[in-house]
Amino acid sequence: MTAQQPLDEVTATVATDAGMLVLWDPQRFEAVVDYDTWEDELLEDEDIVRHIQAGSLVPLNAGGDGAFAVQIRSGTAAAPAALTERETAHQLVASQPYLFVSRGRALVGGIEDVSGDASDGVIEHPVPEGRYAVVVHLIDWQAEAGSQDAAGRPVPGALPDFVVLIDLAQPGQGAFRTAVNTFEAPNG
């Protein structure tokens, strides 16, 4: 079952066994129907970069397998998407903007889930047709007091691992990140 909520925001936990979460336009991947067709489109980093450059895929590169809480938030021209005060206080790093060209919706899941369909465990988020700038924020949710239960699991209301902000691309905005690694490596 997919999680679908109103246009502005959706939060869910998604998992990957391939070390990377991604946001993608399912219409661009309608030809992906099995492992062989997935492999033809996404096996190598150069394949992934091609889709990033085309605006059909944005990496949320977790750098490992696991389940991650992801919040997707869309803004408008009048009210751009932004982090909340809590998210800002616990933000570890933000990506440079990625291009996302929407044909009506975005899906988020493990890279192994990419196809034209929203499979179980994938977040579905409506995004009107158009060109968008997507910024991915990594949040240190565990640093917030009271965010974990006795077993170290997030409590209800805990911040997510990732906050993904989707805003209309500005006219003339041409510099978008195209790297598979979502965040710049720290200097030093």
Q: For the regions a protein language model found, what residue spans apply to each?
A:
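Short, well-ordered loop/turn elements at secondary-structure boundaries
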Residues: 53, 127-129
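Primarily secretory-pathway and cell-envelope proteins
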Residues: 1-99, 143-188
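Extended, solvent-exposed segments with strong compositional bias
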Residues: 85-120, 125-127
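Short beta-strand-plus-loop segments that form exposed binding edges in beta-rich domains
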Residues: 138-140
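A short tyrosine-centered beta-strand micro-motif
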Residues: 130-134
